[in-house]
């Protein structure tokens, strides 16, 4: 009986491993960038739930070109490109405002560096720049290096990113979907959602709407309820759920009302 149970357990384990093989998960707080990464021979090809193995995955890839979707900022369209993995990663990081991203390897040591800012090409270590860089780099590396049909699961990818970078990150996520990759994100960012909606409305081919699904989770007396947010190519979000990213609009309206009231009082 024990032997039969072991055989069944082994088969179940193989099935689970097969199912989960194409899934990659990055948690809500990625690891802070290190000044140097030391290869101790324990890297098993996975980026890690905190992106802690980004440097090793980055250097593991060969120079053989990969196909990926880039974004043309002038025409504001996605275009298919082919480039070595590290070049593709650098291109998308540049689009996100992380310029001159590069890495050096010295025996078992790895170091990431990038331009100090948009006005200088002076290189600085990745640990000497804003925390947001460490949050987005693992997402770009894993997203570009996984294959079509595989799935990337992200929790709060917007953490420590300013609004513009959040919107650019939404474009990157869309580029993965356009290339046949799947992305599941849990987000509180209206900037990411609004960028998705904008791209759907701008899309003349009608292909983006079928690639994007938005669900809103809310509490109720009976537990959590999942509402599907319907998107239209002509009207954007059709059925705004109650309290679905309406706080900013309400706050802006109250600011405008306060300004109007103050001006009216000053005229008295």
Model-assigned labels for residue ranges:
Residues 129, 138-141, 168:
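Extended, amphipathic alpha-helical scaffolds
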């Amino acid at each position: 009986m024990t032997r039969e149970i072991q055989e069944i357990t082994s088969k179940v384990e193989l099935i689970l491993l097969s199912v989960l093989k194409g899934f990659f998960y990055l948690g809500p707080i990625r690891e802070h960038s290190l000044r140097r990464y030391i290869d101790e021979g324990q890297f098993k090809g996975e980026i890690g739930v905190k992106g802690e193995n980004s440097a090793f995955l980055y250097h593991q890839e060969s120079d053989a070109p990969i196909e990926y979707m880039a974004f043309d900022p002038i025409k504001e369209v996605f275009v298919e490109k082919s480039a070595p993995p590290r070049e593709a990663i650098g291109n998308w990081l540049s689009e996100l405002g992380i310029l001159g991203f590069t890495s050096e390897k010295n025996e078992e040591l790895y170091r990431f560096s990038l331009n100090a800012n948009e006005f200088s090409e002076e290189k600085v270590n990745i640990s000497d720049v804003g925390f947001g860089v460490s949050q987005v780099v693992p997402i770009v590396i894993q997203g570009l290096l996984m294959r079509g049909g595989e799935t990337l699961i992200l929790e709060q990818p917007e953490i420590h990113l300013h609004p513009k970078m959040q919107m650019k990150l939404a474009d990157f996520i869309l580029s993965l979907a356009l290339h046949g990759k799947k992305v599941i994100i849990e987000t509180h960012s209206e900037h990411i959602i609004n960028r998705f909606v904008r791209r759907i409305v701008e899309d003349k081919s009608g292909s983006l709407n079928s690639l994007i699904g938005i669900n809103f989770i809310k509490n109720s007396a009976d537990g959590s309820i999942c509402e599907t947010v319907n998107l239209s190519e002509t009207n954007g979000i059709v059925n705004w759920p109650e309290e679905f990213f309406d706080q900013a609009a309400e706050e802006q309206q109250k600011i405008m009302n306060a300004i109007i009231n103050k001006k009216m009082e000053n005229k008295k």
